């Protein structure tokens, strides 16, 4: 049986933790002037992937 391939795009975006998969939040790349400082600060925080998306990410990261 051949080795399973890791999806490199997913590997760069998600990190496996004890509680699930950690990810960066969206909406912090451009058009930042109209967003408040508080909103941008909260968007810097990492969050966990939703429970519905975990199986798909786990399939793409077989060795995580």
Swiss-Prot record:
Q: Which GO terms describe its cellular component?
A: cytosolic large ribosomal subunit
InterPro entries xrefs: Ribosomal_bL35, Ribosomal_bL35-like, Ribosomal_bL35_CS, Ribosomal_bL35_sf
Q: What keywords is this UniProt entry annotated with?
A: Ribonucleoprotein, Ribosomal protein
Query: Can you tell which superkingdom this protein's organism belongs to?
Result: Bacteria
Q: What GO MF terms are annotated?
A: structural constituent of ribosome
A Pfam family it matches = Ribosomal_L35p
Name any Gene Ontology BP term. translation
Q: Does the keyword Transport apply?
A: no
Family recorded in the similarity comment: Belongs to the bacterial ribosomal protein bL35 family.
Would you tell me the protein name for this molecule? Large ribosomal subunit protein bL35
């Amino acid at each position: 049986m051949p080795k399973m391939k890791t999806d490199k795009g997913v590997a760069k975006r998600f990190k496996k933790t004890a509680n699930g998969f950690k990810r960066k939040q969206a909406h912090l790349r451009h058009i930042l002037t109209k967003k408040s400082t508080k909103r941008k600060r909260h968007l810097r925080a990492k969050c966990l992937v939703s429970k519905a998306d975990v199986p798909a990410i786990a399939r793409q990261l077989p060795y995580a």
